[in-house]
Amino acid sequence: EIMPSLVGSEMCIRDRYKEGKYKTFHLADEVFFQSLKRKPVIINTSRGEVIQTDALLKALNSQMISDAIIDVWEHEPEINRDLLEKTFIGTPHIAGYSADGKANATRMSLDAICKFFQIKGDYEINAPAPVSPIIHAKNHEEAVLQMYNPTEDSNRLKNQPELFETLRGDYPLRREEKAYIIKY
């Protein structure tokens, strides 16, 4: 295990090597949280099993961390409801669910298929235009929240955690910032 001096610093970066087939499994475990010198906000949008749920709950309860923003969950769709209630923001694994993300994923898939079959791809993948492409805001934070307010998704999940898969499967299309014109 390698622990650079950055652990607990402003960056809160930790290198850690684990043996075995699943090298990222529970990288953020009890030892990880105990090693933090500051109280960071933990954000997980990568893979649910990267963070050990019980260790994260313990870190939240003992104030080793300031807060948690979780989009991917250990054991989803059967997520830990205690953890969900304690998160600042908890969403149903939808971080990549923007229309732009789906268009990019489709483009990458088509590129790979064309490369594999050695054919020239002649296609254009565009995300649909936003319903209201012009945003009027006082500042950038307000503009971003008009484009997408994650607390709305969080509230839906916290109100009906048993609908995790439905909330994820029926997720409405949203656009990324580049699709909008912001007027301050």
Language model feature labels by segment:
Residues 5, 32-35, 82-83:
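Structural alpha-helical scaffold elements that stabilize or flank donor/cofactor-binding regions
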